[in-house]
Amino acid sequence: LDKVDITVKRGAVYGLVGDNGAGKTTFLKLLSGHIYADEGELTLFGCHSRKDIEEQRRRTGAVIEAPGFYPQISVEKNLEYYRILKGVPGKRAVDEVLELVGLADRKKKRCRDLSLGMKQRLGLAIALIGEPELLILDEPINGLDPSGIIEIRNLLQRLSREKNITIILSSHILTELEQLATVYGFLTDGKLAEQITAEEIKEKCSDYIEINVSEPERYTAVLEKKFHTESYKVLPDKTIHIVNPMMDIGAYSRLASENRMDISRLERRQVTLEEYYMDLKNGGRKYA
């Protein structure tokens, strides 16, 4: 990692995006105290010294890789163990997090008998004991089925919205991260390539018409003449992107047919997080 400096507003959901080996898990492990830096300096909540950082970590909860718990004992007893370990007073804290993550009716169940989705919920419950301000999650939906993914997504959104908990998480499922995160950090080779909000991405990446025609050069010429616009890009594969289209999609189809050009593809699209990330990796020319 090299000078990774992120700023996250209270209650935001911060999505870390990057290829395998980019540094996502290493960064989250450093934040949560699972590993320590060989060199350099870590700052957390404005604190620099190891002693102060350890104190600040009381304000955090984390699930890194597989949640750790004892499979032979009940959900409730596992949480009671972690409550004591964290020095959180009052058994009521266990009941509160069980209710929060939707495990109150399964508290007597042994952990080995839980589904994968329920185990993920238990991991979150352990992280939430002590009412952390910051939740650090590494691949929280990894291995879940579609219904489990939806359950965890809804839970994290509720924690952010109702409890004002700040969440930093990584996920290789960018379509899911797109539905959850309010701000993104793109990591490349251990460096923060860009930090941008979901709203800023939306503003930079407006709807566009994607069209493949038999004669792209002639099509763009008649496009300019007919609609008085230069808001288009011709990609290396000759695909045309008409940015901020002012006409309905049928008008662009008629333009081709009136000028005797064949269309192989024509659709209205919105730039996805995956497309934005791939463009950023390739130099960030498309959506600058």
Stretch-by-stretch model annotation:
Residues K191-S214:
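Conserved beta-strand-loop-alpha-helix hinge in the C-terminal portion
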Residues L103, R158-E162, E203, K225, ...:
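Secondary-structure boundary motif
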Residues Y36, R57, I201-K204, K233-V234:
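Short, flexible turn/loop "capping" segments at secondary-structure junctions
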